[in-house]
Amino acid sequence: MADDELETYRLWRIRKTVLQMVHDRGYLVAQEELDQPLETFKETFGDRPSEKKPARSDLTILVAHNDDPADQMFVFFPEDTKIGIKTIKAICQQMQEQNISRAIIVVQTGMTPSAKQSIGDMAPKYMLEHFLEAELMVNITEHELVPEHVVMTAEEKAELLARYKLKDSQLPRIQQCDPVARYFGLRRGQVVKIIRPSETAGRYITYRLVV
């Protein structure tokens, strides 16, 4: 069925972008997962989404951070076209049972206002992020117009501010809702190094504070 073929392709692309995203945040993802071709995805999960092969719940991802295996994160793909508060509660229940405090929710078309509100209410105990499927069809960091972004550690940030005798407030800013900031899961107060090619200097580096 043509619809199944298209939907299988979409789910493969979306899951691939999510795996790249959590890998770029420092979570452990096997190289064969990052490189998984469409055919392998079909063999693993199925190619008939209309018959729940795969069901979106089959695509759930659980990853641990390279620097701290106790820092784990879920990625959920709920079946509901629009996410309501009931789905958020079910997700938090699963996180509580497994003692995991971070998750990304991949949303098909949107969320109800009460679901969005509940995500805010859960923080900081449960840190939930959400992305629309349409946002994950491509990896924005691979776009030729998006320069390389490197997230700085707290130590690197402190060293930068000391070296240039700066305060946080003197750095240029990047909004937390910026697509690249969302991709990296940046939080307010973090600093990101942006590396652009330069015809004269080879490369041109700027720093931005997340606000």
From Swiss-Prot:
Pfam families: RNA_pol_Rpb5_C, RNA_pol_Rpb5_N. Keywords: DNA-directed RNA polymerase, Nucleus, Transcription. It is found in: Nucleus. PROSITE patterns: RNA_POL_H_23KD. Its main location: nucleus. The keyword Transcription applies. GO terms for molecular function: DNA binding; DNA-directed RNA polymerase activity. GO terms for cellular component: RNA polymerase I complex; RNA polymerase II, core complex; RNA polymerase III complex. SUPFAM superfamilies: Eukaryotic RPB5 N-terminal domain, RPB5-like RNA polymerase subunit. GO terms for biological process: transcription by RNA polymerase II; transcription elongation by RNA polymerase I; tRNA transcription by RNA polymerase III. The keyword Zinc does not apply. It comes from the Eukaryota. DNA-dependent RNA polymerase catalyzes the transcription of DNA into RNA using the four ribonucleoside triphosphates as substrates. Common component of RNA polymerases I, II and III which synthesize ribosomal RNA precursors, mRNA precursors and many functional non-coding RNAs, and small RNAs, such as 5S rRNA and tRNAs, respectively. Pol II is the central component of the basal RNA polymerase II transcription machinery. Pols are composed of mobile elements that move relative to each other. Belongs to the archaeal Rpo5/eukaryotic RPB5 RNA polymerase subunit family. Component of the RNA polymerase I (Pol I), RNA polymerase II (Pol II) and RNA polymerase III (Pol III) complexes consisting of at least 13, 12 and 17 subunits, respectively. In RNA Pol II, this subunit is present in 2-fold molar excess over the other subunits. This is DNA-directed RNA polymerases I, II, and III subunit RPABC1. It comes from Caenorhabditis briggsae.
